[in-house]
Swiss-Prot record:
Residues 12-21, 29-41 have a biased composition (Acidic residues). GO terms for biological process: protein ubiquitination. Functions as a substrate recognition component for CUL4-DDB1 E3 ubiquitin-protein ligase complex, which mediates ubiquitination and proteasome-dependent degradation of nuclear proteins. It comes from Bos taurus. One of its GO terms (cellular component) is Cul4-RING E3 ubiquitin ligase complex. This is DDB1- and CUL4-associated factor 16. It is found in: Nucleus. Keywords: Acetylation, Nucleus, Ubl conjugation pathway. It comes from the Eukaryota. Pathway: Protein modification; protein ubiquitination. Coiled coil: none annotated. Interacts with DDB1 and CUL4A. Signal peptide: none annotated.
């Protein structure tokens, strides 16, 4: 019998196993395997759409933008002219989302949406294909964008022109 090697330290044994696993992974994940090749070309990346749908879900609470303001006051219109108003943000999200439209299931036409303040979040729209989280989120997104665009257009069409706003704004608010 040859000289006996003392049993290796359990910690160093696990470290060497980790190194072997890492080496194996590095070797197997070389140029031969590319994760982008494994993605199904028919199914596009829906992460941007899901992210935008989540942003819109958060913004759907924006009925408070309309409730506390009197529609006849200058402040109501000034608030809508502010680019940080959720309506503008929703429209911006809609523009960014337009490049994803090819990857979204086709939906039935969107009916006239009632004001969010009176009914809360609009109901989900029935998709033409089997229900999925994506199609429900996108239906809600479509409705929110349609409502936001319509509300913004209607309000801005009644808004006081910029030239008259300084006369209406109290001195405390003017810069």
């Amino acid at each position: 019998m040859g000289p006996r090697n003392p049993s290796p330290d359990p910690l160093s044994e696990s470290e060497s196993e980790e190194e072997e696993n890492t080496n194996y992974l590095n070797e197997s994940s070389g140029e031969e395997w590319d994760s982008s090749e494994e993605e199904d070309p028919v199914v596009p990346n829906l992460t941007p759409l899901e992210s935008l749908a989540w942003q819109v879900k958060c913004l759907l609470k924006y009925s408070t933008t309309w409730k506390p303001l009197n529609p006849n006051s200058w402040l109501y219109h000034a608030k809508l002219l502010d680019a940080s108003t959720p309506v503008h943000i929703l429209r911006e999200i809609g523009l960014r989302l337009s490049h994803c439209s090819h990857c979204v299931p086709k939906l039935e036409p969107i009916p006239e949406w009632p004001p969010l303040a009176s009914c809360g979040v609009p109901p989900f729209q029935k998709p033409l294909i089997s229900p999925s989280r994506l199609s429900r989120d996108h239906a809600t997104l479509n409705g929110a964008l349609q409502f936001a665009t319509k509300q913004l257009s209607r309000t801005l069409s009644r808004a006081t022109p910029h030239a008259f706003l300084p006369k209406l704004v109290p001195l405390a608010f003017s810069s």
